[in-house]
UniProtKB/Swiss-Prot annotation:
The keyword Transcription regulation applies. Keywords: DNA-binding, Transcription, Transcription regulation. The lineage of its organism: Bacteria, Pseudomonadati, Pseudomonadota, Gammaproteobacteria, Enterobacterales. Residues 20-40 bind DNA. This is Uncharacterized HTH-type transcriptional regulator YcaN. GO terms for biological process: DNA-templated transcription. SUPFAM superfamilies: Periplasmic binding protein-like II, Winged helix' DNA-binding domain. It comes from the Bacteria. It comes from Escherichia coli (strain K12). Residues 1-60 form the HTH lysR-type domain. GO terms for molecular function: DNA-binding transcription factor activity; sequence-specific DNA binding. Belongs to the LysR transcriptional regulatory family. InterPro entries: LysR_subst-bd, Tscrpt_reg_HTH_LysR, WH-like_DNA-bd_sf, WH_DNA-bd_sf.
């Protein structure tokens, strides 16, 4: 019995995403085309591969068994295709990245625009999200986060310069409530608190390994919303210097406790496994590495 390999590719996409619509987005097909492909495969195999309801799709026992048995072979085929892609004069494919919103805004977008100019046959899909998502489960090639929150079992590469966090508020706030002179003084101020999507609040870290659990009436899980709240005078924020530079230059915000602020490792791009690295990710890492080498050479003393 001859099988259509594209139907198996559709089967794997639906199994990974547990959704016809998400599988269609991944493969560039409509939900009806996905449904037709799965129905055709089930008819040829004479087994039901998925349990379907109006709200969910899940593998049957037979479907789960087929998925687990065939997945190593399909992974190997994908690796071989990616390796063949390396022989092309111009690599092709899709690069899917999940990044923190602030990273996309302050440096990642310029990197990706330059990358797509150099590799016009690679399509880039960027999703911005301040939560620490499971990039493998969500189908991303890589993620971009601050190094301090990248999971230890991931392979990571520095993608940006060191970052500096600034304690900042509006001049009006400081005129009304005074300026903190020591990090412990922040406990007597209204602070705009950033909270991770997990619910854990971000503690403000300073020199001399000092960490302050600030408090305030406004708790947010979005760094852009945090900045807006600080600009509206809601309290003191702890924000990336690159994020607020324009507001410092125009006087809308002021920094305090600068002697306590320290540089820390910046953003990293991370991914799960070198063996299964997509052609797009491999090309992007090479592009980033080449740019870093050129930058270091420009700043090397003559």
């Amino acid at each position: 019995m001859r099988m259509n390999m594209s139907d198996f590719a559709t089967f794997f996409a639906v199994a990974r995403n547990q959704s016809f619509r998400a599988a269609g987005d991944e493969l560039g097909l409509s939900s009806s085309a996905i449904s037709h492909s799965i129905k055709t495969l089930e008819q040829r195999l004479k087994i039901r591969l998925f349990n379907r309801t109006t709200r969910s799709v899940s593998l049957t026992e037979a479907g789960s068994n087929l998925y687990e048995r065939l997945r190593p072979a399909f992974d190997e085929i994908q690796i071989m295709l990616d390796e063949m892609n390396d022989f092309r004069l111009t690599p092709t494919g899709t690069l899917k990245i999940n990044a923190a919103r602030v990273a996309a805004r302050i440096f990642l977008m310029s990197l990706l625009v330059g990358f797509t100019r150099e590799y016009p046959d690679i399509k880039v899909e960027l999703t911005t999200d301040d939560s620490l998502v499971d990039i493998v489960q969500q189908g991303f090639d890589a993620g971009v986060r601050l190094s301090c929150i990248v999971e230890k079992d991931m392979i990571s590469v520095a993608i940006g310069p060191p970052v500096k966090l600034c304690v900042a508020a509006t001049p009006e706030y400081f005129a009304r409530y005074g300026k903190p002179r020591h990090p412990h003084d922040l406990l007597n101020h209204q602070c705009v608190v950033f909270r991770y999507p997990s619910g854990k609040p971000f503690h403000w870290q300073f020199a001399k390994e000092l960490e302050i659990a600030v408090a305030g009436n406004i708790i947010l899980d979005d760094v852009d919303a945090e900045l807006e709240a600080v600009l509206m005078g809601a309290g003191i924020g702890y924000l990336l210097y690159e994020q607020i530079k324009e507001y410092l230059d125009t006087g809308r915000l002021e920094c305090v406790l600068e002697d306590w602020s320290t540089e820390r490792p910046g953003f990293q791009i991370y991914y799960p496994n070198r063996q299964y690295m997509s052609c797009g990710l491999r090309a992007f890492l090479d592009y980033v590495k080449t740019g870093q080498i050129c930058q270091s050479q420009r700043h090397r003393p003559q």
